[in-house]
Structures are given as C-alpha cells and as structure tokens.
Amino acid sequence: MKTPTLGQLATENGAQVVGDPDLAVVGLAPLDQAGPGDLSFLSNPLYLPQALASAAGAVIVSPADLERIRADGQAEGRNWLVARNPYVCFARVAQRFDRAANADSRTGIDPRASVAPDAVVPASCFIGPNVVIESGARLGERVRILANAFIGASAEIGEDTLIYANVSVYHRCVIGARNILHSGAVIGADGFGFAPDIGPTGVEYVKIPQVGRAVLGNDVEIGANTAVDRGAMADTVIEDGCKIDNQVQIAHNVHVGAHTVIAGTAAVSGSTKIGRFCVIGGAANFSGHLNIADRTTVSGGTSITKSITKPGGHYTSVFPFTSHGEWERNAAIVRGLSKLRERVVQLERRQRGENNAPAQNKQDEEKSS
C-alpha cells in the first residue's frame, strides 16, 4: 500500500488538516512513543501537555482542543488533524493501516481440510488446514476460515466474515456478514436445559433437546472462548453491531439488541433480553427471563436480578475496593445491620412514647423499612 498523506486521511475521515497536508503518515503510535512519521491522537484534554510534548508528526484533535492549543500559542509549526471525534477518527485510520498490514489474499481450500460435497464454498473464500465443513453449510463471498475450525451441517456464514482457528459453529446456526469470531469461540452449543424428575431416591435431570439456533447479525465480533448457546425452541439472537469480549457466556434464548457491547467474563442467563446500545461491564451477571431497557449501562461485577424498564440508566452493585482491614470492619458492620435496625425501631418508639403500644409495632417497622 502506498503511504497515505495527512491530507488523504483527512479526506477519508471527514477531518481537516491544520499544517502540512502532504505529510507522509507511516504509522500510528501513542503520544509518548510517536516519531516524526507517526500519527497520534488526543481524546482527553487532560493529556494536552503530552500532546504538546509529543514528537508525533501529527496529532488528531477535536476543534475545542485545537482552540485551547491556539490560545496557548502552541499550534504553529505543527500538524493537526481536526476531527469531531478524535477517538473514532483514530479507530478508522487504524483500521486502514491494519487492513494493509494484514491483507490476506489467499483463496481456495487447503488439501487438509474436509469439506462436504454439497457445502457451498465460493471460490473467493479461504479454507485453512484441518477445517471441517459439514453437509449443507453455505458460505458467502470472501469468507476466511482458519485452521481447525468447525462449521456444522446447514450452518450459514455471511460474506467477508473472518473465523479464526479453533472456532466451532454448530449445525444450522447463522453468522451474518463481516463478523469476526476469535479463537475458541463456540456458537450454538446446547443450552443448559434440564427438567427435574423428582423420584423417591432424589432428583434426576432429564435433558431438554435444544432445537433452536444461535443467530448472529452483521458486523458482530465475538471474543476468544466466548459461548453463545443455541435456543431451546426459539433462537438465541445477537443483533447487528454487537461486540462481545472474551469468555462471555450467552445462555439459550437470550436476545442482545443491536450495537450493545459486553465486556469479558460477563454472563447472561437464559431468556433474558438486553436492549440496544447497552454497555455491560466485565464480570456482570444477569438472572434469567429479564428485560433490560435500551442504552442501559451496567458496571463491572454487577448482579442484575430484576428487569430494568427505564432506558439510559446506569447501575452498579459492587463496593469500591479498600484495604483488607477496612473491608473486614465494613463487613462486620454489614453483618450487624439487622440488629442495628431493631435498635433504631425501638428508639423511635421510645421517642414517640409508644413503648406500651404493641398493636403499633408492625406499622412502626413497616414505616422504618
């Protein structure tokens, strides 16, 4: 790829150059590591001193930050790429460089792969060594499936999707266009469905066949070792644009709305519906059969046990960390809260002169709770 100029990058990303539009941009780097040929970015005004001290050939900034730099008299003699959202601009420029560095023009089927005779594999696809594609599977144009991946019977893979090594896509599952499935991801394994049969000697669990599918929309990314289970009867659905991190558990019949992001080790129990544009922190967990409103933010480690109906809320259930000794003292206080409440109720009764009014006890407790 020919080295792009700052002016070309501005045109591609709807940005404006202040400085030399002919500057050749050879790479991207953080502010403190960038050199004269590198492009860096400033997305937080707190790092303005680092931007001014950087040796970067150019820095992506917002219009407001450029005005601050000009007010300090330090804009002249440097190159700035002015974008409405510097972080997004940086991401798109990074995609450009990543495509060039990792361009994979390979096509065809590796002789060590096993592809069913009736599977549909366009000539533009690349199928790596030891890949297994079962009967009836259908691939779109330019799909790339790397070593040791498994595509089950009658599965569908959309165009321009990249499936890394050791991914498993079970039978009849649907993967949309431009998806990225990272190594170890499992799409469409059986959901955790069992019917308890209580007998005289105990409980036996009878397996419920999971006959639904896992269906992923377009532009979805699934992290390493993440599991998206197939539905029990209806489908498990991940809508367009969702980004799911590593080691996340999506249980059967879950529905995740478009452009929701879920960080690592989160777990969503069966039949829960998460809305659009939600942000789910790492290690958050959801009980089953809940409805989560659009644009909900859930902090890392939070346990959601009830539905959230109001859009745009931010929810947290984890105490910030403290020293171990302080945590132990706080834990002791929490353990004593029920006794403390009883004492408060008694003191309130005394204050109102109600010590000898047992008929009011229940009402008093309800008012205090």
From Swiss-Prot:
Pathway: Bacterial outer membrane biogenesis; LPS lipid A biosynthesis. The active site is at 252 (proton acceptor). Gene3D superfamilies: Hexapeptide repeat proteins, MurE/MurF, N-terminal domain. GO terms for cellular component: membrane. The keyword Transferase applies. It catalyses: a UDP-3-O-[(3R)-3-hydroxyacyl]-alpha-D-glucosamine + a (3R)-hydroxyacyl-[ACP] = a UDP-2-N,3-O-bis[(3R)-3-hydroxyacyl]-alpha-D-glucosamine + holo-[ACP] + H(+). GO terms for molecular function: N-acyltransferase activity. InterPro entries: Hexapep (IPR001451), Hexapep_transf_CS (IPR018357), LpxD (IPR007691), Trimer_LpxA-like_sf (IPR011004), UDP_GlcNAc_AcTrfase_non-rep (IPR020573). It is an enzyme of class 2 (transferase). Catalyzes the N-acylation of UDP-3-O-acylglucosamine using 3-hydroxyacyl-ACP as the acyl donor. Is involved in the biosynthesis of lipid A, a phosphorylated glycolipid that anchors the lipopolysaccharide to the outer membrane of the cell. Belongs to the transferase hexapeptide repeat family. LpxD subfamily. This is UDP-3-O-acylglucosamine N-acyltransferase. It comes from Cupriavidus metallidurans (strain ATCC 43123 / DSM 2839 / NBRC 102507 / CH34) (Ralstonia metallidurans).
